[in-house]
Amino acid sequence: MLPLLPANAEQPNIKCPGNNTPEMRWCASKKLQESNSALEKKLPRAVLMEWQRATKVVCAAAKKPYLQGTIYPQLVVGCDDHLNRALLKEFKGLGD
């Protein structure tokens, strides 16, 4: 699932986690962009693409019960971000 923002969008004045659905979606997309950027620095492009493909499939399956709800896109984006951040923790050293 792609981030929920246009590529050239100005950053709105939103305090995350947001007060309504559009703000919460914006915050979830922002967090996903941040974790994707961090992974781009850690993984070769081909591996990152495979990871993103896999997390999209896994998150879509995990959130399938909410498929017909308006919250579904936000849940999938949040799931993708959580998995990204779990992987990023694996790159930390023992002393971190």
Predicted regions and their residues:
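Conserved active-site segments centered on acidic
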Residues: 1
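N-terminal signal peptide c-region/cleavage motif recognized by signal peptidases
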Residues: 4-6
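N-terminal alpha-helical modules
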Residues: 8-96
